[in-house]
C-alpha cells in the first residue's frame, strides 16, 4: 500500500513539475513575441517602390530569412529581425531609399552599422566593414579601404554606397543583415523586395 501511494505521489509530483515547466515555457514564448507590423502585404503591394535600390552589390543568395529560427551562433530559438544577403567580402552596400542617417554604430552584435530614416521607414545595414569615429562635429562610419565616410545626420540619396559587406559583430560569414521597420514595427524585407522587383520589371 505504501509503495502504491509513493508511485501515485511521484506521478502527481512529476505531472506538477511538467505543468510548471510548460507554463514557464509558454510565458517565455509570449514575452519573446515580436510586435507585428502595420505594413501589411496589401500596404506593401499598394506602395510605389519603383525608385528603390537593391541593398547589396555582387549578391549571391539569401542565407537567412526574416522570422523565428535556430541561431547559427548559439543554437537557440530566436527572432531574426531582418534578411541576410550573402555577398563577397568588400562588396558595396547601397542605400535602399533616400533618407537621413539616424545612427552609425559599432561594437554590438550588429557590428558596424548604419540606421537610416525614410519617412515612416527605418532601414538598418549590419556587419559592415570599418568602424565608427567621433569628431568635434559628430559621429561617422569610416571605411578607409572602401572610400566610405557616412556621418550621423547626413542626407543620403537612394542607391548611394554607404558601406561594404564585412564580418563585424556576431556573424558566421560575410553578408549584409538588412532590417526594415515601418512606424516602429519590423517588416519582412523579402516582401518589400518582391514587390519592388515586380514594379521595376
List each language-model region with its residue ranges.
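Histidine-centered divalent metal-coordination motifs
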Residues: 80, 127, 175-179
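Acidic, glycine-rich catalytic/binding loops that coordinate metals and/or anionic ligands
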Residues: 49-50, 102, 134-140, 147-160, ...
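N-terminal secretion targeting segments of exported proteins
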Residues: 1-45
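Active-site region of chymotrypsin-like
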Residues: 83, 117-151
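Surface-exposed, glycine-biased beta-strand/turn segments
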Residues: 30-113, 118-119, 131, 157-158, ...
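Short acidic/polar mixed-charge low-complexity motifs
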Residues: 91, 121-124, 185
